[in-house]
UniProtKB/Swiss-Prot annotation:
Known role: Involved in peptide bond synthesis. Stimulates efficient translation and peptide-bond synthesis on native or reconstituted 70S ribosomes in vitro. Probably functions indirectly by altering the affinity of the ribosome for aminoacyl-tRNA, thus increasing their reactivity as acceptors for peptidyl transferase.
GO terms under cellular component: cytoplasm
Residues forming coiled coils: none
Organism listed in the record: Corynebacterium efficiens (strain DSM 44549 / YS-314 / AJ 12310 / JCM 11189 / NBRC 100395)
Homology family: Belongs to the elongation factor P family.
Pathway(s) annotated for this protein in UniProt: Protein biosynthesis; polypeptide chain elongation
SUPFAM superfamilies in the cross-refs: Nucleic acid-binding proteins, Translation proteins SH3-like domain
GO molecular function, one term: translation elongation factor activity
Keyword list, A-Z: Cytoplasm, Elongation factor, Protein biosynthesis
SMART domains (alphabetical): EFP, Elong-fact-P_C
Main location: cytoplasm
Name under which the protein is recorded: Elongation factor P
GN (gene name): efp
CDD domains noted in UniProt: S1_EF-P_repeat_1, S1_EF-P_repeat_2
Localization: Cytoplasm
């Protein structure tokens, strides 16, 4: 059991018999009336998000979730194949297990997978990854109609917006949470 004061992003709760992960939360103390907590919860099985409001101080049942370090091996077209780094056991995860961040997965990348009662729930990539630019058009110095960015295709096939000075072959640091360009990595 946890109180609403213990809420943090990533915490997994049991709500109405379903496992739901806190994506966002906000403590609200209105001028009149009791304090409450607004949350955005994501169902770990279906991926659907719902908004839920809790009175401050309410006890909520939490789910025991273990996180294991794993290595991403490959995508067989219908699922991701991962290997536990300690036991070398292989696991299958559905293609939506990493959410939108799955487009940044590279073979042999280390990831974390969350388990509940022995069942794999979802995976998480590191906050940032280094990826090589496979293709991007040359940036023209005078071309500012696009706000100083251009599309670039990364080695995983993902397309992101990058500054005009980025060239094909550059290695970039990319934020896996929102797919944004962070910096160019020195080779």
């Amino acid at each position: 059991m946890a109180s609403t004061a213990d809420f943090k992003n990533g915490l997994v709760l049991k709500v109405d018999g379903k496992l739901q992960q806190i994506v966002e939360f906000q403590h609200v103390k209105p001028g009149k009336g009791p304090a409450f907590v607004r949350t955005k919860l994501k169902d770990v099985v279906t991926g659907k998000t719902v908004d839920k409001t809790w009175n401050a101080g309410v006890k909520v049942e939490t789910a025991t979730v273990d996180r294991r370090d794993m290595t991403y091996l490959y995508n067989d077209g219908s699922s991701y194949i991962l290997m536990d780094d300690k036991t070398f056991e292989q696991f299958e995860l559905p293609l939506d297990a990493f959410g939108d961040a799955g487009r940044f997965l590279l073979e042999n990348m280390r990831v974390q997978v969350s388990f509940h009662d022995g069942e794999a729930l979802f995976g998480e990539l590191p906050v940032s990854v280094d990826l090589r630019v496979e293709h991007t058009d040359p940036g023209l110095q005078g071309d500012r109609s696009t706000g100083g960015t251009k599309p670039a295709t990364l080695e995983t096939g993902a397309e992101i917006q990058v500054p005009l000075f980025i060239e094909t072959g550059n290695v970039l640091k990319v934020d896996t949470r929102d797919g944004s360009y962070l910096s160019r990595v020195n080779n």
